[in-house]
Amino acid sequence: MEQFHDGHHVWLRSRANGLYLCADDDRSGVSLQQDRASAHAAWAVHILHFNGGDVLMLHSAANGRYLAAYRAEGSWNVERRDLNRLPSLTFSWYALGSRYGDDVLLRHFKSMFFLRALFRRDRISNSGGVGLCAMDRGTTTMQWVVEAIPPRESVPTLPDPLSPSSLSGVYRVWYVRANPDGIICPNNWRLFLFYGRSVRNLSALLAIELGIRRPSDAILCVRAGFFGRLTPLVTNLPHNNMLLNLDIVVITAGTSAADRLRYPNVDAA
């Protein structure tokens, strides 16, 4: 567990095929991809102290949702979910040392299975899948290289507004503005419907709603579940074909709360 530091970001690279564990461009998918220079490949470390020990949880730097494993129709699936309960073994992992250098094995607390890269690699898309394995077979498919991601020195620029043809889906956005110390009042949550996926458009609308003169002063943070940690929203919203809920906490630039936010420098060498 010494390679995982609370609040920091990491890449997880499969020893078997060299691909990185990534959050897909949808709401819940997880896969292996070659490109690590993306928020989708960065994972924030959330250490939970539980029963006298430490539990590892990982949430995506893209949309804040947590790496989870759950049982469905007799098999275990890996995906991202909102953290609405603590403690929850669905989201809990333990990093074990492997037989090879500093590589780690990630063992899921609830199933006691290991996170593994599915051995096949799609040569066309240069991607792969992930799943769980019941036992340590000593193969590289279960070994993960933990690469620390340094923080950025400045807030990343939001993507350009999407074209009208890219505006799909609708979100039920619950939003609240935090005070300068990052504290939010539970009674101040408000709701509006947002059409599309553009984070820049969403930022501009929330700045207007909250009376913030410059949209760049409104730092949008997504909260994936009641117990989810705040994740700065720097990518466009996931594709969706249904009405989805989205919790947004707005942090004001220049405040102590803004200074505590950490952005992974995914372009670092």
Predicted features by range, described:
Residues 212, 241-244:
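Extended, charge-biased low-complexity segments
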Residues 1-200, 209-227, 252-269:
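Lectin-like carbohydrate-binding module/patch detector with strong preference for beta-trefoil
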Residues 5-7, 243-246:
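Glycine-centered loop/turn motifs
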